Amino acid sequence: MEIFSYIIIAVVAYLLGNISTSYIVAKRIAGVDIRTQGSGNAGSTNVLRTLGKRAGAMTFLGDVLKGVMAVLISEFAARLVGIDTLLAGYLAVICVVAGHNWPAVLGFRGGKGVATSLGAMLAVNPVITLMCLAVFILVVAITKYVSLGSVVGIGCSPIFMIMVKNKAGLIVALFLTASVIYNHRANIKRLLNGTERKIGQKKE
């Protein structure tokens, strides 16, 4: 019964992740498929760069909310059936981010998972999430590179989990870090060769 409950929670969280805010916003505002615009990524940064601040903010907030809701729904369901709420929450984090990054409904072409990771982890472990967010803001403020801030910010999460001796959280943090690095591999290459765009920099 417990295993079945966790499977249901995982599936529901993954399906929530499949709700692509960027796709919906781009279709509503500009009538375009965001995957054919800019970098081709179905994420808030690409929406911001191609459709403007309003659309970018809507996408970012939608992705964050999606992560929060996945965890809250999972923890509520866990309480109802009497299973571990923390484990259910962490499982939801992994699955909602996986659903966002690799959505079945969009041919497994999704976003990079930063905003959804932020929302999901904020719901399950707010203190560490805010610490990672502070690192992100600091790195972006200094370098003007959103991609670098994303990688470094989430990359700090395993370190923070080790510091507080949170083994379950460490596993989730390692997954999030690996997925963000993987999805930012093109950005990392551009950072290394000096061609990555900074905030406000126009595409040449």
From Swiss-Prot:
One of its GO terms (cellular component) is plasma membrane. It is found in: Cell membrane. GO terms for biological process: phospholipid biosynthetic process. GO terms for molecular function: acyl-phosphate glycerol-3-phosphate acyltransferase activity. Keywords: Cell membrane, Lipid biosynthesis, Lipid metabolism, Membrane, Phospholipid biosynthesis, Phospholipid metabolism, Transferase, Transmembrane, Transmembrane helix. It comes from the Bacteria. It is a multi-pass membrane protein. Pathway: Lipid metabolism; phospholipid metabolism. The chain crosses the membrane at residues 6-26, 80-100, 122-142, 144-164, 168-188. It catalyses: an acyl phosphate + sn-glycerol 3-phosphate = a 1-acyl-sn-glycero-3-phosphate + phosphate. Belongs to the PlsY family. NCBIfam families: glycerol-3-phosphate 1-O-acyltransferase PlsY. Probably interacts with PlsX. This is Glycerol-3-phosphate acyltransferase. It comes from Clostridioides difficile (strain 630) (Peptoclostridium difficile).
